[in-house]
């Protein structure tokens, strides 16, 4: 219907405010975003950004720094052991978790793609390695690859605003523990944090409240979200500790309105803070 209206408007020499954004929204579909995310992965595996469908003036940001395509993680082909993508048709962006564990230089990567009119306008990656928070790519691969993140039945999904609110409430806990009770904790629920895992003994009814901070006045600022309602998932990208804090991405999945999975990638560009493990964090 939008295309019919657009054709009429163009033929009549008129242009309606907001029509361009409506057309862009119509052209941004789940299959097109999935294809773009797949093209990104194929290009990364070959170390060939030239294979990306880039928009004119497209930018690449790696670990919060503007980086030329072809440098950084693009410097050589990347062996990808596992990946998972969130597709947000509302804002035409994707987020892909990428695990490269079986190499001499392992990585866990979180990449955001911004798509405009079918082309990639922005690529932003958080590339974590051995010097980053609780990093263990083998552990991350072991646990993430066995989780079930399939499309949820409609009756078990949460809407966009609910998913964002849950992520926001979770982030609020770091500054004020009063937010803890606002989070819909589920059982079972597990968290992968860098590679640390909250259910190493494979208990039948684990909780991902283990190791959650008890409120330490730590702000989580510059919050940006990518939402995939069909997966019940939301990724929140933040500055851990306030402006110029640690680059961080938390990914959440809700099932039946309850938290089921939490994944965390946190970079330590100037070295990780020395923090003793929480007393309630399970040990292997």
Q: Where are the regions that the model predicts?
A:
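Positively charged n-region of N-terminal signal peptides that target proteins for export
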Residues: 1-4
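Bacterial N-terminal signal peptides
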Residues: 6-18
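C-terminal and inter-domain tail/linker signature
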Residues: 23-284
């Amino acid at each position: 219907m939008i295309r019919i209206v657009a054709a009429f408007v163009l033929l009549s020499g008129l242009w309606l405010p907001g029509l361009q954004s409506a057309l862009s929204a119509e052209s941004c579909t789940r299959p097109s975003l999935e294809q773009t995310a797949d093209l990104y992965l194929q290009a990364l595996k070959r170390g060939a950004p030239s294979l990306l469908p880039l928009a004119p003036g497209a930018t690449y940001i790696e670990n919060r720094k503007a980086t030329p395509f072809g440098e950084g993680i693009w410097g050589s082909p990347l062996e990808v052991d596992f990946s998972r993508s969130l597709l947000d048709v509302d804002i035409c962006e994707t987020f892909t978790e990428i695990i490269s564990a079986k190499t001499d230089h392992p990585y866990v990567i979180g990449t955001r793609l911004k798509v405009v009119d079918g082309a990639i306008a922005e690529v932003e990656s958080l590339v974590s390695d051995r010097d980053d928070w609780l990093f263990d790519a083998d552990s991350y691969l072991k646990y993430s690859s066995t989780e079930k993140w399939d499309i949820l039945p409609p009756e078990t999904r949460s809407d966009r605003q609910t998913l964002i609110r849950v992520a926001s409430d979770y982030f609020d806990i770091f500054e004020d523990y009063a937010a803890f009770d606002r989070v819909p904790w589920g059982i079972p629920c597990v968290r992968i944090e860098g590679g640390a895992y909250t259910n190493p003994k494979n208990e039948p009814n684990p909780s991902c409240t283990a190791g959650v901070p008890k409120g330490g006045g730590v702000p989580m600022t510059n919050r940006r979200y990518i939402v995939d309602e069909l997966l019940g998932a939301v990724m929140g990208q933040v500055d851990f500790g306030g402006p110029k804090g640690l680059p961080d991405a938390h990914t959440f999945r809700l099932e039946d309105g309850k938290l089921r999975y939490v994944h965390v990638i946190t970079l330590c560009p100037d070295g990780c803070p020395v923090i003793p493990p929480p007393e309630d964090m399970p040990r292997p």
